[in-house]
């Protein structure tokens, strides 16, 4: 279970870095297409899901 928790945290950190870099790049291009908005909202939803899953996993691991 500890390895799964570490993988969840690694995925959370990787997605956070991707969002930190990706969101400003998408907004600075000036292209407000639906695909870009869906990508940003999808990444934000995945970030929130990973946050809650990692929080629940931390309760089980500790």
Curated annotation (Swiss-Prot):
Highest taxon, organism lineage: Bacteria
Q: Which GO terms describe its biological process?
A: photosynthesis; photosystem II stabilization
> Under the cellular component aspect of Gene Ontology, which terms does the record hold?
photosystem II reaction center; plasma membrane-derived thylakoid membrane
What the entry lists under SUPFAM superfamilies is as follows:
PsbZ-like
| Keywords annotated in UniProt | Membrane, Photosynthesis, Photosystem II, Reaction center, Thylakoid, Transmembrane, Transmembrane helix
The main location class comes to membrane
TM spans (from-to): 8-28, 41-61
Could you tell me the membrane topology recorded for this protein?
Multi-pass membrane protein
Q: Where in the cell is it found?
A: Cellular thylakoid membrane
Q: What does this protein do?
A: May control the interaction of photosystem II (PSII) cores with the light-harvesting antenna, regulates electron flow through the 2 photosystem reaction centers. PSII is a light-driven water plastoquinone oxidoreductase, using light energy to abstract electrons from H(2)O, generating a proton gradient subsequently used for ATP formation.
What's the subunit arrangement here? PSII is composed of 1 copy each of membrane proteins PsbA, PsbB, PsbC, PsbD, PsbE, PsbF, PsbH, PsbI, PsbJ, PsbK, PsbL, PsbM, PsbT, PsbX, PsbY, PsbZ, Psb30/Ycf12, peripheral proteins PsbO, CyanoQ (PsbQ), PsbU, PsbV and a large number of cofactors. It forms dimeric complexes.
Q: Which family does it belong to?
A: Belongs to the PsbZ family.
Q: What is this protein identified as?
A: Photosystem II reaction center protein Z
Recorded source organism is: Acaryochloris marina (strain MBIC 11017)
